[in-house]
From Swiss-Prot:
It comes from the Bacteria. It catalyses: (2R)-2-phosphoglycerate = (2R)-3-phosphoglycerate. The keyword Isomerase applies. The gene is gpmA. InterPro entries: His_Pase_superF_clade-1, His_PPase_superfam, PG/BPGM_mutase_AS, Phosphogly_mut1. Gene3D superfamilies: Phosphoglycerate mutase-like. Its EC number is 5.4.2.11. Catalyzes the interconversion of 2-phosphoglycerate and 3-phosphoglycerate. GO terms for biological process: gluconeogenesis; glycolytic process. Pathway: Carbohydrate degradation; glycolysis; pyruvate from D-glyceraldehyde 3-phosphate: step 3/5. The lineage of its organism: Bacteria, Pseudomonadati, Pseudomonadota, Gammaproteobacteria, Enterobacterales. This is 2,3-bisphosphoglycerate-dependent phosphoglycerate mutase.
Amino acid sequence: MAVTKLVLVRHGESQWNNENRFTGWYDVDLSEKGVSEAKAAGKLLKDEGYSFDFAYTSVLKRAIHTLWNILDGLDQAWLPVEKSWKLNERHYGALQGLNKAETAEKYGDEQVKQWRRGFAVTPPALTKDDERYPGHDPRYAKLSEQELPLTESLALTIDRVIPYWNETILPRLKSGERVIIAAHGNSLRALVKYLDNMSEEEILELNIPTGVPLVYEFDENFKPIKHYYLGNADEIAAKAAAVANQGKAK
């Protein structure tokens, strides 16, 4: 049976991950640790014998630079890459820039967990005159006002990620190309929920660690057979737990 593999990677730790702040569409770069994570992911993929024909990422530099470091480690810096806002992190609205633990102290752990992980829960929205509104950013100049979020739930993130998967990424896999996607915690959670047919309750508890390759294997009908992380299982579990704890009061 022919098996098709897809590799997903959440960007390495960003400067705002390190500061425990809601990031969303804010274009913060990788921390030093994040660069190291991305380089380690590239080495791991190379050691495991992976190479690719095409790459996808968002229009945010923490994901773009993660992909650069991975491809550099694979000696595939030349690889064609498509960047799309549809793979951006979920937009966190008026929470963007706020410290997660301080926000939990103010509103309570459960409210922040719902904002971070609730399926259809949207954080407080931005207003269009807020400097954080994406309509002020030239990279989104070609988007319609209806496409520009003031806030997003995971459900709304799915509404942009899954059509992009079905219309753009999946056809490339079906043509036989080997694909890697470097994206974000919630855009990847959106895709994982769809691929694994997870319930709203199950996705609430899913935490994707930074900088760890996640491999999906598909059968000839492009249905997922299994998925697994590459690397040390204990280290990966610890990183996932750290993601879960970010939104708790200290």
